[in-house]
Amino acid sequence: MKFDQTSDKIADRVRNLRSSAVRDLFAAAVRPDIISLSGGMPDVSLLPQRAIQKAVHAAITDERAVALQYGSTNGRLETRQALCDIMRDIGVRVKPEEMLLTSGAQQALNLLGETFLDKGDIVLVEGPTYLTALSAFNAYEPEIHSVPFDDEGMRMDLLEEELKRIGKGNKRLKMLYTIPNFQNPGGVTMTGERRKRLIELSHEYDFMIIEDDPYGRLRYEGGHMVPLKAQDDRVIYLGTISKIFAPGLRIGWICAPADVLARISLVKQGADLCGSTFDQVVVEH
């Protein structure tokens, strides 16, 4: 049986999906005659290979009974505790029961879309934003509304104007997705003043903030910015090991209130039962 975009067997929400341009460029990057600038692929020689070797050895010898077995949907408790310690370093106090491990932050984006978005719901993003986040959300057929940014991050005056326009319509605003540190692709960092105002607006207009923070630890000058999550527990925070350890170890995490996380966990059960316990043990070590 031949399947194409006209097939009546394909779900409507999938029929109009398009591949991310970034992933298409990754596919071309395997050619030996190509020097790829398409994605944030680190130089392998700079990765902590010796530390990874030791961690893999520990996983396969000392903890093989755990590392080679199924795990819990929310992720290994010890790994979550280790990541909670990392979060504490940036000013976010979170408990293991408020964290769920994912297959990279990309799976986290998809889980959030499946958990929260109905067709026609509104998602606010920085314009432009991370293309593959849009790919994750678009599977659930929301309306994506972009808000411009400048050198200080998303323009709060323009955001407030957009919120007022949305309030006059009949569509539901569900969430705002932001990369406040070294925004992708803009590279800008949201100021502390604008972060405070964003949180105020989220309460006034009752929408969720999704804080995607893969780059926050890559700051080499100046002090670290206080995460939105540290200022408001309602914020859903996404982290990843990809940019600070190795992208081949597919470990990301969601920090959210426990009742919200319980809903996301139900969705993850249907997606993959559990993440890679082996990767979790390696990261923990």
PLM features: what roles do these ranges have?
Residues 2-72:
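N-terminal "arm"/small-domain region of PLP-dependent enzymes with the aminotransferase-like
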Residues 40-44, 106, 130, 181-183, ...:
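Short, solvent-exposed loop/turn segments at secondary-structure junctions
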Residues 45-47, 109, 133, 186, ...:
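Glycine/Thr-rich phosphate-binding loops of Rossmann-like dinucleotide-binding domains
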Residues 61, 66-205, 216-231, 236:
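Conserved core of the PLP fold type I
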Residues 212:
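Glycine-centered flexible beta-alpha turn that most often forms the glycine-rich phosphate-binding loop
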Residues 231-285:
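Conserved core segment of the aminotransferase class I/II
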